[in-house]
Amino acid sequence: MIIKPKTRGFICTTTHPVGCEANVLEQINITKAKGPVANGPKKVLVIGSSSGYGLSSRIAAAFGSGAATLGVFFEKPGTETKPGTAGWYNSAAFDKFAKQGGLYSKSLNCDAFSHEAKQKAIELIKQDLGQVDMVVYSLASPVRKLPDSGELIRSSLKPIGETYKSTAVDTNKDLIIETSVEPATEQEIEDTVTVMGGQDWELWINALAEAGVLTPDCKTVAYSYIGTELTWPIYWHGALGKAKMDLDRAAHALNDKLSATGGSANVAVLKSVVTQASSAIPVMPLYIAMVFKKMREEGLHEGCQEQINRMFHERLYRADGAAPAVDDANRLRLDDWELRDEIQQHCRDLWPTITTENLSELTDYREYKEEFLKLFGFGIESVDYDADVNPEVNFDVEQF
C-alpha cells in the first residue's frame, strides 16, 4: 500500500515502515560515530524499548557497547490493510540491524505492567543470557492494568490546586492559542502516581532480583523530566510531577537494595525532546520549539540518541571508571545544558512575545513539526513515499 501521514490531535494515525527503519538506522549511525562505550553493559533489558528514550537506550547498549538486548514493549503489528504502530516498525528495524551486526536481539510484545511479562522476561534471560547487567525502565503509558485485580487505572496531565492557563500552540492549525487545564482531583493525582510512578519499576527489579537474573553490579535507570518554571505548573508541580517524585522514592529504595552487591539504581533526568509522549503535554510543543532554536544556535542541541549516548559515555560508564556525578537526590542530570541560565532566560523573554505570525521566525516550530512526523516515519529525504510498501513486517518477537 501507499502510506501518507494522517494526523489527529497529537498523534499521527499512519506510520511508514521504511521511514521508521531509516530513523533507526540514523540513530545507530549516530551511536557508532560516537565510538564504543568503555566498560559498557553486555546484557541489557529495556522495558519500553520501542520509541523515544527507550529505543535510544537499546541502540546505545547494542551499537555503542556490543550488548545483547531484550526489549519489552506494547505495539500493534501492521495488517494487509493498515499500518502498524511506529514502535512496531522501530523494533523490527532494530532487530534486523542488530542481527546483521551479529548481536543477540529478542523482543516481547506484551503489557509490561503484567506479572506475565516479568515472568516471560525472566525465563528468556535465564535461557539465553543467564543474567543482565543493566535494566532500563522507560515506560510512558496513559493506562495501567493493575496486575493483581485487573483494574484499569488512567493517568492525568493536569495541574494541582488551580486551573493552569498559558499560551500554547495548536499543532493541527499552527495557531498560537490560550489554553487552560482544570486541576486534578485527589483521585486523579493518586491514579497518575499508580500509572507513571515507581511502583512497576520496583516490581520489575524485585522480580528480576528474586529470580537471580541480575548481575551483582547491575545498574538500573528510569527516566524523568523536571523542566523549568515555564512547564512546572503542568508537569513537575502537576499530577505527573507527583508520579515522577514517586520514581525518585523508588530509585532510593532500589539503590539501597542493589548497592549492597555493587549495583545501582538512578533516575536520569533528561532534556525535553520531540516524542509521542511529550507532544501530548500542553505547552510542551511551544516550549520545545523555543528551546531547540536557542540550543541549536549555542551548539548544544541533542536529540534522544545524542542524549542517551552522553548518559552512557559521561555518566554511567565513564572511561575513567569513576562514579557518575549526581544531584542532591542521587539523580543523573542530562538536562544540564537545557537548564543553563542563558537558555532559560531566552525562553522566558521570548514566551510572551510569540504570536501566530512570528511563530516560525522566532522558534524552531517548523523543525518541531518535521521531527514529529519523523517519529512516524514521514518526511525523510531518502524515502520514496509514492512507492508501494508492505505494512506487514515480521521479526523475532514473542506476543502474548
From Swiss-Prot:
Substrate binds at Y225. The active site is at Y235. Gene3D superfamilies: NAD(P)-binding Rossmann-like Domain (3.40.50.720). Its EC number is 1.3.1.9. One of its GO terms (biological process) is fatty acid biosynthetic process. Pathway: Lipid metabolism; fatty acid biosynthesis. The record marks E75 as: Plays an important role in discriminating NADH against NADPH. The keyword Oxidoreductase applies. NAD(+) binds at residues 48-53, 74-75, 111-112, 139-140, 244, 273-275. It is an enzyme of class 1 (oxidoreductase). HAMAP family: FabV_reductase. Involved in the final reduction of the elongation cycle of fatty acid synthesis (FAS II). Catalyzes the reduction of a carbon-carbon double bond in an enoyl moiety that is covalently linked to an acyl carrier protein (ACP). This is Enoyl-[acyl-carrier-protein] reductase [NADH].
